[in-house]
């Protein structure tokens, strides 16, 4: 027979409440991260999701600097929610690597993709379209 004293029932109820609150907060945080990513992409001409020490990210930033363009840069290694943003990018574009570059809301990709878009002239067309 299971002892279901009132004290154990209260403890179990409190434990369930804490778990449900934590799940609710996690869902809220995920929605907040998703909203941040989408807002950054839609509100800025150029967005680079980057890490400050990453050589590929530095290359991407240098390309825009040479084009006299100033991207909105999100340095994931300098944010508490950087890992969550990377997982959101995985859901959104299928990649969680950095950099991830967006121009006028269009996903360009990583550093190699950006270099190819520059070489083909596609990047310049996207930048001129804004």
Curated annotation (Swiss-Prot):
Domain of life: Eukaryota
Pfam family, one: Glutaredoxin
Localization (cell): Cytoplasm
Gene Ontology cellular component terms for the protein in this record: Golgi apparatus; Golgi cis cisterna
Keywords, sorted A to Z: Cytoplasm, Disulfide bond, Electron transport, Redox-active center, Transport
Residues annotated as domain Glutaredoxin: 34-130
SS bond partners: 54-57
Record has Cytoplasm as a keyword: yes
Task performed by this protein: Has a glutathione-disulfide oxidoreductase activity in the presence of NADPH and glutathione reductase. Reduces low molecular weight disulfides and proteins.
Family: Belongs to the glutaredoxin family. CPYC subfamily.
Protein name, per record: Glutaredoxin-C3
